[in-house]
Amino acid sequence: LAEQLSHSHIYRGEISHRRFHPKAHSFAYQLFMLALDVDEMEAKQCPKSIFGFSWFNLLRFEEKDYLKGEPESLKQRIKNKVIALSDCEDGMAEVSRITMLVQVRCLGLYFSPANFYFCYDANENCTQVLVEVSNTPWNERHYYLVPIEQNNNDDNSATHVTNKNFHVSPFMNLNMHYQWLFKPPMSNSDKLFIRIENHCNGDNKDDDNKADNKQKVFDATMTLSKKPFTSKAFWQLWCNLPAMTLKILLGIYWQALKLLIKRIPFFGYQKSQPTEPK
């Protein structure tokens, strides 16, 4: 059965966070994410391993964890959200496959700061990415739609800009915008790269955040390598990186404590702004 999962893979590597203003702060850690083909997950295909769909699996896929609260099947929920964030429905007509780069339940616990839904056309070109962002402890979700520009170079410059409309960190306000760069999962590449940059908006006049206009305040970079979606690979992963969800949650609060100690300006909860269609 493992051979049937032609589009699902394990990705393992490193994520780094760097803060540049008002004080420098950085960290990096090892992590894994699963690139799951939506059709294969809806068909409940997987090798016999610690990953599966039952309560006893150490790593468990629950369809309800993604685009939570939306009606219909997972694939249709993704399509509906993409259409809602687009200025037309034509884009989804060209989507033949969706790969979701996500965390799954680990020992029954689920939290994922960001899930990425890569949409591919019939020629296996990734055309757009739906990004599902979650915050803690509020457990809210917000969605960004990022078009992917096709190019054949290795330029790591950010390729798309969206306004920041969702409160994630109490150490950054909402008067910012994101710059995104994706090198998506591809059948002809073993590498995956995602970078998100936070830049101040040009009209940022907040006295507690005196960054220069459009200055880069923060970036997060994830560099991952593809591994086979097999029972052996899952056991190796578990031995090296157990309890991934707990590691993520503890890491968020540990780094927040460090920022408090550094006296980084603190912003109370900020109400999310609606995302406008492209």
Regions found by a protein language model. Name each.
Residues 1-278:
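Mature, function-bearing regions of proteins
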